[in-house]
């Protein structure tokens, strides 16, 4: 029986694994895809918003003073996992967590693991948000953007009002024949906290406005997709006092970069209470859910930043899991 099973090998899971290893725990990490898969799914050559010291798994192991790229951060995480000999099993799709007395059974498609404690660090992107409109299909719509070259000389509709959509529109603006950006908000130049404001970083918003002014990107605010046809998308427009209107946008492809939500199925089926915001109920000090011995960390919680995910992953081991295991062994 393991002391701890960690589900997920993103920044929080890797940080927790380091903490478990350094505290002498018998642990394993179960990952259904690849190590740091969330980072892997970032756009190619993307520069992150945080600096190296905010993203490193161990202090002093990542160059300081600059913001790393996707590739640089992936290399750092993979190198750390290799050098520290972290016990990570990839390709293990966990289907169920069952509490049995003072231990857990963690079941995957192929096998079963027994553990005294479980830490779920499966990230915040388990359930992709969909447009949910007629005509939506994989042929017409993509929900993840990695590089612009497949869309060269094509007409692309980007849907979304956040950083991902804004950056994708910018990346496409020099290659695509036409880029249209559809956002639900009325204005992009308001702060995120303001009604109708967009959560776009200032250093992304400035070049976005430049591309809009140069007619490289057509912005359609106060809009949402109503229907998708084989060659276009029908947008509903909120025209204020004039009521609603519709506009047809010709497009070869649609990028719906409208976010995702955590998949809390494992937690809820294990008996953990899920709050109205779709995230688990947990003690903000220990990160223990309503099921004793079942912990959470990373973006599946309400901590949305990588820096915080790394800190919490390590902290859960030292201040929550270790004391619990020591109490149980007395």
Region spans (language model):
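Beta1-alpha1 glycine-rich phosphate/pyrophosphate-binding loop at the start
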Residues: 11-86, 169-200, 274-277
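Residue-level detector of alpha-helix initiation sites
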Residues: 10-11, 34, 163, 301
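Beta1/beta-strand and adjacent pyrophosphate-binding region of the FAD-binding site
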Residues: 1-12, 154-162
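A conserved FAD-binding loop/helix module that cradles the flavin
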Residues: 196, 297-330
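FAD-site-proximal beta/loop scaffold in flavoenzymes
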Residues: 136-150, 260-305
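A Rossmann-like FAD-binding core segment of flavoenzymes
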Residues: 75, 83-106, 113, 176-277, ...
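Short hydrophobic core segments
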Residues: 5-7, 112-125, 157-159, 250-259
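Rossmann-like NAD(P)H-binding beta-loop-alpha module
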Residues: 154-177
